[in-house]
Amino acid sequence: VGTGIIEAAICIANGLIIHGVLVENPDGFVEVLVLWFAAQIVMLLVDLVYNKITSYDIHEEIKKNNVAAGIGYAGAIIALANLVRHGVEMHAESWIGVAQNLGVETGLGLLLLPAARFMTDKILLPGRSLTDEIVNQETPNIGAAVIEAFGYIGGSVLICLSFG
């Protein structure tokens, strides 16, 4: 089930990215492909960052069928895809402008992903640890994972709104 949740998040992420690419480039097939490919490369960074900010290996937890770990990771995927969508969707006069938009949005997202996890851990789950709730229990806490996922997604929405 955890793998299915991640697959669903990847589908949602691709939908967000394709939407963002097509909004500003409805007629340019080459531009659409280049931006989509660049966005896919950026999305690979989610895996690296997420594994660094958690004290557990997401891939091992998914192999153990830890649904809660899959939910948290899915939230991170969707959050960064939302930022990538907004970065490529913003109007720019040149490829350099699009790259700058994408870089700023993605950079902020990758920097704030750990901050969102920390704030979720300390503010929304006081006295508890997300890691303990998600991986160190006999039955992983799906509710804590949903809170983590929405912390990431909510943070990405706030970043997008701050850039108009």
Name each model-derived stretch.
Residues S156-G164:
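Juxtamembrane boundary at the C-terminal end of a transmembrane helix
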Residues T3-I12, A69-L80, G143-G154:
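Select subsegments of transmembrane alpha-helices in polytopic membrane proteins
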Residues D27-M43, G97-L113:
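Alpha-helical transmembrane segments
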Residues P126-F150:
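Interfacial loop-to-transmembrane junctions
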Residues L22-F29, Y56-H59, V88-A99:
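Membrane-interface helix termini and inter-helical loops of multi-pass transporters
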Residues V1, S55-G72:
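Alpha-helical transmembrane segments with an aromatic anchor "belt"
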Residues N14-E24, V84-G87, C160:
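Membrane-embedded alpha-helical segments in integral membrane proteins
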Residues Q40-E60, L108-D132:
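Alpha-helical transmembrane segments and their immediate juxtamembrane interface regions
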